[in-house]
Amino acid sequence: MPPSYNEVTSWKPSNLVSIANGIFALKASLDLEAPLAGNPVLDLTPAEWTGEARGPADSRAESVTRWLRNVADEYGDLASAATSGAANIESAVTTLKNATEAAGDQGYILDRGSREYTVTFDPNTAPSGAEYSADLAFQHQTALPAHGTASDQAVTDTKNAIESALSEIGGITPASIATASGTMTRTTNQAKAFEQVYGLFLIDGA
């Protein structure tokens, strides 16, 4: 059963855009920081650092820089998922609002708190002289819950896209980096924090 009209229209997908903007800013910062992470080692000349440790140090520096760039890309994907999802949810909500208004203009009034999308005919809101039509009532009774379902599906699709992006972020940390620096823990915590924020968006329509 789809969420009611009142539930759907209480959602505020614009909040996802605000979150996405913050993630895009984080991506930009990571893009800038990525070369700085490895360059202090990679920029040393062979004369400045020789010995058996140089090769592994270079490899690790390259790994850190490459990982940061990959993380930046994944955060970009996460932000894009949130932005696209917000647009899709907003579009679905607008479609439901417009269909409800159109039905009302013909005299078919939606019970906006009903998850069954009950429609009743009110001659006072219908065009002058209009009478109840079983065909029109059926059309609105069928279309409106379909729009409610589409709105719910837009939220589900957005949730799945965001969870997929979060999973990618959590899965790309090299073991050497995670073990030595605790970066994996921080990345996982960031992912969980974002998921909690998004969860509140779903539950509270915030």
Which residues does each predicted region cover?
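Membrane-active amphipathic alpha-helices enriched in small hydrophobic residues
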Residues: 197-206
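N-terminal secretion-targeting helices of virulence/extracellular proteins
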Residues: 1-178, 182-193, 202
